[in-house]
Amino acid sequence: MIVKAYAKINLALKVKGKTKDGYHELDMVMLPLELHDSIDISLLPDIYDTYVTCDDFSLETGEYNLCSIAVRKMKEKFNINKSFRIHIHKNIPIGAGLGGGSANAAAVIRAIKDLLKLKISAEDELDVAKSIGADVPFCLFNTPSRSEGIGEKLTPIEVNKEYYVLLIKPKRGLSTKEVYVKYDEVGSSSNPDVDELIKALKEGKTEEIPNYFGNDLEKASITLLPEIQNVKDELKAHGFEIVLMSGSGSSVFALSENKHMIEKESKNLEKKGYNVFITKILK
């Protein structure tokens, strides 16, 4: 069985505080992208253990890979005694803040449910997703959403325009953990207004998005990797008004209704040596 694992971007990421457990509480606007990995998953004979492979050898495929963790969580939750062969065909860049690992885990949850014809509720699936990571619940349902808390509270939102996305991934990625550690040191210079941003998306007022979007982790990520600021400046110099780092970085995106502009400027940026992806928002 082959399932798609869709990337995401954050049009808003606001850090609201910390839980007693030390997790950062967030308020985010998350949008799924057409850009996706493909997950090839099949049942193995009982004598074998689950194993994960990937066509990108830089990806950790051992027990700490989120696909491996998803299998273990599904087996524990639903008393499954099967093993699986999982191969990841990677299109989503690693360490980019695009939710690739979370998307892979969510795809494995869906695939195991379908392969074994499990009669489980959406709530049960969500419980497994929450136990794996903050972005996995969003990736499981894969619809434009407001995500609150540590990612467990999802509210669907309306996006009433077609949006195209130009992504640039710097050569170096960033780990989410190191970014949050740095955030605790340097704070944020961003102030996204999630309520007003959601309203602008619903009403199709693209021109208002720059007034309300933002990412509280940008300052921390740029401190760790100044190239992120260079990429943002480059995209703005090419005429884009909605330019933001996604998640904890290191990827930066430009959002536009103008598909021709996205395609034209992507070619110009590729000529300058940037690692460029073109995709669009899924609704």
Listing of model-derived features with the role each one plays in the protein:
Residues 1-96, 114, 118-123, 148-150, ...:
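ATP-binding N-lobe of GHMP and related small-molecule kinases
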Residues 11, 39-41, 67, 101, ...:
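Residue-level signal for inorganic ion chemistry
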Residues 13, 37-41, 135-139, 145-146, ...:
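Short beta-strand scaffold segments in enzyme catalytic cores
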Residues 32, 130-131, 137-140, 156-161, ...:
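Solvent-exposed alpha-helices and their adjacent loops that cap or buttress functional pockets
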Residues 50, 141, 145-242, 257-270, ...:
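Conserved, helical-rich catalytic subdomain that frames metal- and/or nucleotide-binding sites
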Residues 76, 111-118, 188, 260-262:
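A glycine- and small-aliphatic-rich helix-loop capping segment at beta-alpha/alpha-beta transitions
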Residues 87-116, 134, 241-256:
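Glycine/serine-rich anion-binding loops at beta->alpha junctions
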Residues 105, 109-146:
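Contiguous, small/hydrophobic- and glycine-enriched helical/loop subdomains that border
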